[in-house]
Structure formats: C-alpha cells, structure tokens
C-alpha cells in the first residue's frame, strides 16, 4: 500500500504544476442482438520466434485468457490482437467473448462475478462492472476485489513498447483515471476518448437561413426556425442525447463542487492523491480548474438523500433543457439511435446531437451517398450561454472522457495474472493499439474516438472529424439531476416521464414529482451496495 501511494503521489506531483496552472459509460449503439463467443486463429507468424524464455509464467503449461467485450466496438481489432498474440505465445489461448449489447453485458457481469467466479472473464469493460455491481462506483469495484488495481503495473516494463507501461500515456491522462476512479486506484488504463457534438447539414441550414449554432441560444433559435421551415424534427436525438442535459447541469452545479469533494478528515482522504481538493473553489474563468479533483460518492449520496430531486436547482436545469429537448423526436430517450442517425443522413433532420463513437460510421455513410443525395456537413460544439440564466456559468462544458475502459478481473493465481497483464501490455502498446484501430476500421466496426496512447494516429479525415468533439470536460452531475438515474425496474417509468416532459404533456414540476420515487429508489440501492452510513468521516464496507 505504501509503495502504491508513493507511485500515485509522484504521478500527481508531475501533473499538477503544469495542468492545474494552465487549466482548471454511456450508452453504446449495437447492431446485433445475439451473443457470440469467438476464438482467434492460433497459427504462427512466419519468421517470428516464440517469446518464452523471459515470460513471467510457466510456458510449459497451457492456459486461457478470456476477453469479454460488447459487440461492434473494436471487436474486429480485438480478435486480430488475440490472433497475433497467440502467435507469440502459443501456450496461452486468448478467447474473445463478444456480448450482444449493454444490457446483456451487465447481466453477464452480475452472474459471472457472483460467488467463486469460476466463469468470470479476465479482461472486461470495467465501467460496466461498476454499473452492474456497484452502481457506477468503479473504486468500490476495486475495494470489493472485482477489479485489479494497475498502479504498480505502471512501473513494470512493457516488452512490446520499449519502456515502462506508464510511458505510453501522458501524466495528465493517468491522473485523470486516478481522479475519476476515486483517487485511490487505477482500475483501468486509458485507451481512447469519446465526446459529443452537434452534427449539422450546412446545405439545409443555408436554405433555411440558419447560422451554424455555437451557443445555447443559437441552438434554440435554429430549432425554432427549422420547425417553422417545415422540419417536424429539427434536431434528431437518441438516448445518448441526455448528455446535453448533463452539460446544462454542469453549468449550474459546478459552483457547488467543493461540497462534494473528498475532504480532509474524511475516511477516504489521502493527501498524496487529493491535494487538488484542498480549499477548492470553482473558477469560472478557468474551465479546467476541477479536472483533477476527486469527488466523494458518499457526499453525493448524502446530498441526494437529504435534498431529493424536486429542487429549485433542478427545476431551472430542466426548464433550460426543455427549450431544446422539446424539438427532439418522440420517444428519443428509449429509441435506438440508428433511427436518429438515419434521419440526419436522409436529410429529414438538419441537426443531430450524437457521440464520437458513431462519427466514423456517419462519415462513411455520408461519403457513400450518391451525388444527388450528398450534402455539406460538419460538427460544432455548443460552447456557451450567450446570456447565461441566473445561477448558471457562461461556459458550457461537454462530455469529453475516456471511452473504452478495459479492466482486469482480480485473481489470486499469479501465473494466470501474469499472462493477462502481458496480453494487456501487448494491446496497450503503440503497435497493438494501431493494430486494434486499423483492423476495426477496415472491418467497418466503430471506434469510439481518438486514441490517447502516444504515437497512435488515425486517418487524416477521421482525425479532423473527431477533433470537433473535443471540449472542456464537464464533471458528471447526473446523480444530482436524476438524469439516467434509475434502477432496472424503474427504467421504463423514467423513460415514460422523460418522454412526457420533452413532448410537453407534463410540466417540469410534474416531471420532478413523478421522478422523486424513481430517484430515491436508485439512491437507496447505491447506498446499500456501497455500505455507506452517510458519514464521510467514518470508514464503510461495501457489501458483497
């Protein structure tokens, strides 16, 4: 533990001087509905020697690593990685288990990590472990022994990258992982980032004499003008578009950041990793000022339990969201984003709010349109309020965060763990990451966004498109607003209330009143799983 804290402290010190002075999961789209398990080919690469002499495991013993992933996102690349790795290490089979969709994946995590974990995979989407087992708290997933802490692994040599594991990443990105995971552990290493942007059809906007929106007021006015011009759905949106509400919530709540940070005297306090929290006050002139602060989930839950969702703050936030959300299509929150994308590509909707993990597909689709159906298009960030409402900051920060969050399931089998870590290092090397991206794109699969591993770049056109998703990153305030905050049992109710609200069938007061029970049910489940006593100064024990 002392060594781990020393490593984290050194990392934090290297980052803070430059980054803080200079600046303050997800719902994914899947196209298959069945679950499949696939194994890569084990043929040897011509002219390559097996790497066995310096292996940290028993090369005379066969073993299997299982990589469990959600369909379509990097799956082609991951299969290629497995195939090439087995050419180097034929004693280790790598199985790529492809699960059909998000819900099936969460169910798999719950069943496979229950009890003795005999059927548990080895490398998983760590954020989905958090969603399934600890109500989005990845730090607690480490505490409970589900996920392996990679802190010490950062100092290990990566034989596939010519240096230490940490050398593949910027200090800033490693520190962000630490901050987002609760300030104590490294449950994953960064691979890529995702963001959200407004896609626009320039030809249709010009025809309707509408400027490209860049402010919140611009977006409101654009939707109003397009509606008047005859577009039934001026802005196409799918379930991921809830992030637009999160942007509005951040502009309001970030002034309260100091109230929900881990603080000196809290049981979780660690001076070496949380110094950014001390005496913190949000600086509106510096939108990056809070990026290395560490939120206290227990303080969040305490606030949520004491204040509920029917607050004046949330009324203001949802009132603002409604000014654009009322132009969303019917049933947007529960619909498949494929329809929203098709409406934009088919020029039914001039605007689309969408994530970078669909950007490559949209770019390819539009490039493939016949000449008589093609159109000029681009992406834009809605970066500010032109005239901020009372209580809101002027800068609108978007979602810009790590996308493919891959974690290792913890195990006491040292030989097996050494193999898992070695494959992970192979993947998170420059050559491995390039292979994963290139194979994925060549097979028509999605990539989530730009790669953060040093030395990995994409096709120039795709890089230029993805650059439009970069924004000052907002902190996550869904816990305060209730947006996407429901148990599985209550999710249909949440969808119904949200659709009634954005379609104008119920008022904001009625929406919040209806959501109060849904909100508290989720909070109570989160508190129970985490073992919180709602006193941050006392240590808690997460329930098994």
What does each model-found stretch correspond to?
Residues 1-66, 87, 527-544:
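Short, low-complexity disordered leader/linker segments with a strong preference
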Residues 44-54, 131-195, 211, 264-287, ...:
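Hinge/lid segment of periplasmic solute-binding proteins
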């Amino acid at each position: 533990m002392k060594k781990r804290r020393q490593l984290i402290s050194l990392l934090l010190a290297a980052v803070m001087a430059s980054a803080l002075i200079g600046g303050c999961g997800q719902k994914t789209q899947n196209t298959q509905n069945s679950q499949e398990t696939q194994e890569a080919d084990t043929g040897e690469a011509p002219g390559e020697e097996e790497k066995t002499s310096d292996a940290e495991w028993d090369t005379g013993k066969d073993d299997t690593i299982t990589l469990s992933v959600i369909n379509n996102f990097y799956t082609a690349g991951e299969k290629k990685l497995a195939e090439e790795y087995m050419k180097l290490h034929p004693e280790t089979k790598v199985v790529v288990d492809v699960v059909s969709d998000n819900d099936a994946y969460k169910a798999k995590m719950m069943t496979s990590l229950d009890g003795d974990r005999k059927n548990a995979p080895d490398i998983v989407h760590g954020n989905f472990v958090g969603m399934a087992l600890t109500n989005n708290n990845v730090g607690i997933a480490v505490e409970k022994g589900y996920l392996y802490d990679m802190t010490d692994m950062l100092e290990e040599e990566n034989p596939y990258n010519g240096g230490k594991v940490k050398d593949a990443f910027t200090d800033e990105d490693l520190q962000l992982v630490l901050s987002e995971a609760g300030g104590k552990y490294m449950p994953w290493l960064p691979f890529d980032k995702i963001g959200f942007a407004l896609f626009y059809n320039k030809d249709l906007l010009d025809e309707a004499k509408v400027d490209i929106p860049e402010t919140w007021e611009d977006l409101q006015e654009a939707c109003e003008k397009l509606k008047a011009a005859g577009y039934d759905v001026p802005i196409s949106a799918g379930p991921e578009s809830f992030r637009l509400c999160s942007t509005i919530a951040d502009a309001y709540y970030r002034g309260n950041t100091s109230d929900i940070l881990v603080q000196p005297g809290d049981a979780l306090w660690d001076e070496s990793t949380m110094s950014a929290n001390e005496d913190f006050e949000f600086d509106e002139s510096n939108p990056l000022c809070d990026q290395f602060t560490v939120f206290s989930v227990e303080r969040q839950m305490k606030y949520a339990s004491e204040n509920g969702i029917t607050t004046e703050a949330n009324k203001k936030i949802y009132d603002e969201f409604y000014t654009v959300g009322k132009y969303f299509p019917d049933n947007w929150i529960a619909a498949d984003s494929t329809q929203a994308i098709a409406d934009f590509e088919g020029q039914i909707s001039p605007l689309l709010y969408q994530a970078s993990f669909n950007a490559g597909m949209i770019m390819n689709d539009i490039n493939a349109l016949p000449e008589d159906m093609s159109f000029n298009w681009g992406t834009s960030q809605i970066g500010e309020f032109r005239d901020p409402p009372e209580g809101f900051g002027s800068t609108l920060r978007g979602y810009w965060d790590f996308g493919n969050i891959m974690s290792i399931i913890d195990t006491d089998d040292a030989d097996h763990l050494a193999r898992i870590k070695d494959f992970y290092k192979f993947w998170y090397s420059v050559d491995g990451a390039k292979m994963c991206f290139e194979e994925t794109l060549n097979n028509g699969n999605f990539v989530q966004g730009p790669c953060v591993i040093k030395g990995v770049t994409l096709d120039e056109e795709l890089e230029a498109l993805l650059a439009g998703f970069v924004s000052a990153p907002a902190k996550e305030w869904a816990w305060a607003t209730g947006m996407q905050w429901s148990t599985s049992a209550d999710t249909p109710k949440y969808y119904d209330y949200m659709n009634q609200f954005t379609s104008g069938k119920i008022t904001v007061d009625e929406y919040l009143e209806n959501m109060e029970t849904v909100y508290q049910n989720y909070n109570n489940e989160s508190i129970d799983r985490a073992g919180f006593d709602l006193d941050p100064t006392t240590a808690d024990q997460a329930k098994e």
